[in-house]
C-alpha cells in the first residue's frame, strides 16, 4: 500500500502487543493486587497504551507506600501524618513521620491555581492539588534528597556513620476530592497525580457540583455504583500509565442528607419518603409560594411546616409503624423480624422488593413516596449514618486499597463499629481515619485519651491516619505568637524564641543557606569549572560562618 503513511512491521507490532499483554498479566499476578478487582483484562489496557511508554518515577513511591501500609497492618500500627503546605514542612515532617498528606482544603484556601481562595468546595481548577504535589515532591523532596546524598557521599563510609540521615522521599497521599468531573476527568486527574509524584490519592462519594468539606452541612451523595465507577476509573488510569498508585475510597455517608438518584438499590434503605398521602409535593408548595412573592425565611418556614405534616420516614420505619397499628397482624415482632431478615441496611434490597414483602406481611400496601420530599435542587432526602457508611465501604472495598468513613466527631465506638462492619466483610482492606482539626478534641476526650487515640485506632485496622490542616493551624499559631512578641520586645523575640530554640533543638534551618542548597549548588558550579569558582555562594565571607559551631 502506498500513500502518506509510515511503514510498519506487522509481525513486530503484534509481537510487541502480545508481550505487553503478558507483562501486564504478570504485573497483576503480584501479591500487590491480591485484593483488587478489575472489570477489564490486560488486553484492554495494552491496546490503549502508547507505543512509547515507561514506568513513572512515582511508582517507586506507590510501591513504597504499599509495603509501608502492609507492615503497619501486620503490626496493628498506623502511619500517621498531616497535610503539608510548603517544602519547609516536608523537610521537618520527614524526620519523624513516614508519609505526607496533601489536603484539598489547604490548597483551596492557599494554593488554588486560579489565585482565588475558597473554602473546601473543590471549586478550584483540577490541576491545583497535583501542582502542589509536584512542588513538594518533584521540586523539593528530590532536591533535599540529592543535597543530602551529595553531602554524605562526599565523605568516607566511616564518616557517614556519624552523620544523621533523613528519608526525604516519604510517600505522598493527595486529595482528589470527587474527581473534578466525570469518568474522563477522573482518568486525566489520576494521570496528573501520577506524573506529579503522588503515591496515592483519595476520592469521595459526594456529587461534584455540590461537594463540601466533610465537616460541613448540605452534603449530597452520588449512588453507590457511580462512586465505584470513579474508583474503577482511577485504577484504569493507573494501569494505563503503569502505576501501583494507592487508591483510597472515602465515604461521606455518615452525615450526608441528600442523594442525587435512587437508581442504585443499595441506597434504597436509606432514602427518606413521605407517609402522608394527603399532602402535595414539597416543590409544588415552594413554587407556588415563590409565585406569591414569598422568599427567604418564609420559604424556610413553609418547608419546616410541610415536613411536620409529611410524616417523613425511612420505608422500614413506615412498615414497622403499619405493623404496630395493624389489627390483622397478631405476632407483631415476628412480622418485623420477617421483614428485617430480608430488608436491612446491608441487604441491598430494592424498594420494590421491600414493598412486595410488606404487602405480603400486612395484606395491604404501605404508602411511601420518596419523590414528594425532594428538595428544590432535585435531590432525594437521605438518612446516612454508620450503617450506611459500612454498606458503602463494603461496596467500594474491592476497588480500593483503603476505605475511609468521614465522621462528625472522633467517636471511638463509632470507629470500632465501622471497622468491625468492614472487616467482617473483607479482611484485606486497610482503613483510613481523618484526625480532623474540625473536631473539638478537648471536648471529645481527655488529654490521656488523645495521647492513645492513634494507637487504639491502629489496633482496629486504621493503618493510615492524618490531620488534614495541622500546618494551617500551627503556622497561624507560630506566626501570631512571634508577631505579638516581636511587636513587644523586638529582636529579643527572634533571638531567644526562634534562633536560640532552633540551635537548642538542632533544627537545620538555622543554617538556612545550607538548607536551601547553597553548598550543593556550589558543588555543581565547581564541577563545571574544574573545581574552582570565585563566585561560590558559600565561600569566604559568608555570614552563615557565624553558625559553624551549630
UniProtKB/Swiss-Prot annotation:
- State the name under which the record lists this protein: Isocitrate lyase
Q: Where does substrate bind?
A: 103-105, 214-215, 250, 434-438, 468
Q: What is catalyzed by this enzyme?
A: D-threo-isocitrate = glyoxylate + succinate; (2S,3R)-3-hydroxybutane-1,2,3-tricarboxylate = pyruvate + succinate
List locations, semicolon-separated: Glyoxysome
Q: What is its EC number?
A: 4.1.3.1, 4.1.3.30
Task of the protein: Catalyzes the formation of succinate and glyoxylate from isocitrate, a key step of the glyoxylate cycle, which operates as an anaplerotic route for replenishing the tricarboxylic acid cycle. Required for growth on ethanol or acetate, but dispensable when fermentable carbon sources are available. Also acts on 2-methylisocitrate.
State the encoding gene.
ICL1
Pathway membership of this protein?
Carbohydrate metabolism; glyoxylate cycle; (S)-malate from isocitrate: step 1/2
The record's InterPro entries line, in alphabetical order, gives: ICL/PEPM, Isocitrate_lyase, Isocitrate_lyase_ph_CS, Pyrv/PenolPyrv_kinase-like_dom, Pyrv_kinase-like_dom_sf
The record's subunit annotation is: Homotetramer.
The record's GO molecular-function terms, alphabetically, read: isocitrate lyase activity; metal ion binding; methylisocitrate lyase activity
* Organism from which the protein derives: Komagataella pastoris
Task: Name the protein family.
Answer: Belongs to the isocitrate lyase/PEP mutase superfamily. Isocitrate lyase family.
Amino acid at each position: 500500500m502506498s500513500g502518506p503513511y509510515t511503514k510498519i512491521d506487522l509481525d513486530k507490532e503484534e509481537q510487541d502487543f502480545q508481550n505487553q499483554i503478558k507483562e501486564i498479566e504478570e504485573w497483576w499476578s503480584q501479591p500487590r493486587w491480591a485484593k483488587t478487582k478489575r472489570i477489564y483484562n490486560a488486553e484492554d489496557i495494552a491496546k490503549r497504551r502508547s507505543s512509547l511508554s515507561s514506568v513513572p518515577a512515582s511508582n517507586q513511591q506507590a510501591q513504597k507506600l504499599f509495603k509501608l501500609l502492609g507492615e503497619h497492618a501486620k503490626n496493628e500500627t498506623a502511619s500517621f501524618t498531616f497535610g503539608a503546605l510548603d517544602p519547609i514542612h516536608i523537610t521537618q515532617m520527614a524526620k519523624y513521620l513516614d508519609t505526607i498528606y496533601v489536603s484539598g482544603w489547604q490548597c483551596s484556601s492557599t494554593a488554588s491555581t486560579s489565585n482565588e481562595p475558597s473554602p473546601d468546595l473543590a471549586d478550584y481548577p483540577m490541576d491545583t492539588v497535583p501542582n502542589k504535589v509536584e512542588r513538594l515532591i518533584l521540586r523539593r523532596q528530590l532536591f533535599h534528597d540529592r543535597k543530602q546524598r551529595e553531602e554524605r557521599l562526599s565523605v568516607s563510609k566511616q564518616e557517614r556513620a556519624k552523620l544523621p540521615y533523613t528519608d526525604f522521599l516519604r510517600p505522598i497521599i493527595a486529595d482528589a476530592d470527587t474527581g473534578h468531573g466525570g469518568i474522563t476527568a477522573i482518568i486525566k486527574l489520576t494521570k496528573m497525580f501520577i506524573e506529579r509524584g503522588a503515591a496515592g490519592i483519595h476520592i469521595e462519594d459526594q456529587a461534584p457540583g455540590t461537594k463540601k468539606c466533610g465537616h460541613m452541612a448540605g452534603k449530597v451523595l452520588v449512588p453507590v455504583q457511580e462512586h465505584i465507577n470513579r474508583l474503577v476509573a482511577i485504577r484504569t488510569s493507573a494501569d494505563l500509565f503503569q502505576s501501583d498508585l494507592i487508591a483510597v475510597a472515602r465515604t461521606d455517608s455518615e452525615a450526608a442528607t441528600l442523594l442525587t438518584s435512587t437508581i442504585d438499590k443499595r441506597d434504597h434503605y436509606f432514602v427518606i419518603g413521605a407517609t402522608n398521602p394527603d399532602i402535595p409535593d414539597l416543590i409544588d408548595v415552594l413554587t407556588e409560594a415563590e409565585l406569591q412573592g414569598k422568599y427567604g425565611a418564609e420559604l424556610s418556614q413553609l418547608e419546616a411546616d410541610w415536613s411536620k405534616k409529611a410524616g417523613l420516614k425511612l420505608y422500614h420505619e413506615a412498615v414497622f409503624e403499619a405493623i404496630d397499628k395493624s389489627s390483622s397482624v397478631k405476632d407483631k415482632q415476628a412480622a418485623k423480624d420477617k421483614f428485617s431478615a430480608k430488608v436491612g441496611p446491608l441487604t441491598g434490597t430494592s424498594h420494590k422488593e421491600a414493598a412486595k414483602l410488606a404487602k405480603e406481611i400486612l395484606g395491604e400496601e404501605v404508602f411511601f413516596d420518596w419523590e414528594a420530599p425532594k428538595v428544590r435542587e432535585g435531590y432525594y432526602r437521605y438518612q446516612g449514618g454508620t450503617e450506611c457508611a459500612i454498606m458503602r465501604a463494603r461496596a467500594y472495598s474491592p476497588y480500593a486499597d483503603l476505605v475511609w468513613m468521614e465522621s462528625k466527631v472522633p467517636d471511638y465506638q463509632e470507629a470500632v463499629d465501622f471497622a468491625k462492619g468492614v472487616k467482617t466483610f473483607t479482611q484485606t482492606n486497610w482503613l483510613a481515619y481523618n484526625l480532623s482539626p474540625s473536631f473539638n478534641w478537648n471536648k471529645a476526650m481527655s488529654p490521656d485519651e488523645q495521647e492513645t487515640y492513634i494507637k487504639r485506632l491502629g489496633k482496629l485496622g486504621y493503618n493510615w491516619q492524618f490531620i488534614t490542616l495541622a500546618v494551617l493551624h500551627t503556622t497561624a499559631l507560630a506566626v501570631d505568637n512571634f508577631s505579638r512578641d516581636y511587636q513587644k520586645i523586638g529582636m529579643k523575640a527572634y533571638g531567644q524564641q526562634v534562633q536560640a530554640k532552633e540551635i537548642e533543638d538542632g533544627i537545620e534551618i538555622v543554617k538556612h543557606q545550607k538548607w536551601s542548597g547553597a553548598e550543593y549548588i556550589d558543588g555543581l558550579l565547581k564541577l563545571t569549572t574544574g573545581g574552582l569558582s570565585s563566585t561560590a555562594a558559600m565561600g569566604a565571607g559568608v555570614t552563615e560562618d557565624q553558625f559553624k559551631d551549630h
